Amino acid sequence: MRRLINHIVNHDLFRWSVMTAMIFYRYSETCMEVTVRVGDPVTLGSGHGYHPGQKVHWYNQSCVGISNGENTHPICTYDPPKPGRRKTMKTTPLPSPLLYECHNSTLSILHVNVSDPKNYCRRKCPPNGNCEFPTCFTLSLISRTTTTRKPGQKTTLSRLKTTPNKHTQHKRSTRRTSPRDYNVTGLPKGFADSFTGNVEAHRAKDAAHSAWILIVIIIIIVVILFFFKIPQRLREKWDTRGYLYKGTDGLPTTDYLS
């Protein structure tokens, strides 16, 4: 036990362990989940944490690979305004109609489609070119349980929001709508029919903040211990026979405390 403590203190293994944990935490693919209903707008991210002058890039893919410098094209880039100029927002490529809007550190999807649920990645780049670690967001859709028709029962309309077929679009009809008038094939599992907001995103953000606070507390404790030389004093107390510290003459010494 004493040899293990001596090895840890002499080689600063605890400090390297803390640094390694911080690096793994930053590179981990922990995405903030946001659920939304099809057809509604949604905003990813928040305005907090944006520093003036930062250029913010948004990608509709996972952050893995983007942090490694792979050649990827953003779907939206917020270019901060220069003195005397208006704000600029660029989308790549420019869609028609406009699908995304980005401002500061947020991305707004103006109309959520069934193809939108996926991972989105945000990367902030200050003017000096040293971009921050990317942040991952997951957009998902949720749905309610649909009801089915049983023999002898009246037809129950599905509560699943669907898209009419081409022959029923732009037509007004007074007859009762039947589920046969809708095309429900090809819709992905998990089609949305309710909106829960950004509760999951806030929970993930709170968990990330808690982890960082814990790491900072551990670092502060380690600094205090080494400032008051507590590990060295404990090592001297346990090393009653002078195995760990010996002077040039081979006898136990306490010069390391001076």
From Swiss-Prot:
Extent of Basic residues compositional bias: 167-177
A Gene Ontology term for the protein's cellular component: membrane
Parts forming coiled coils: none
Residues carrying sugar: N60, N104, N113, N183
Subcellular locations according to the entry: Membrane
Record's bilayer topology term: Single-pass membrane protein
Protein name: Uncharacterized protein UL10
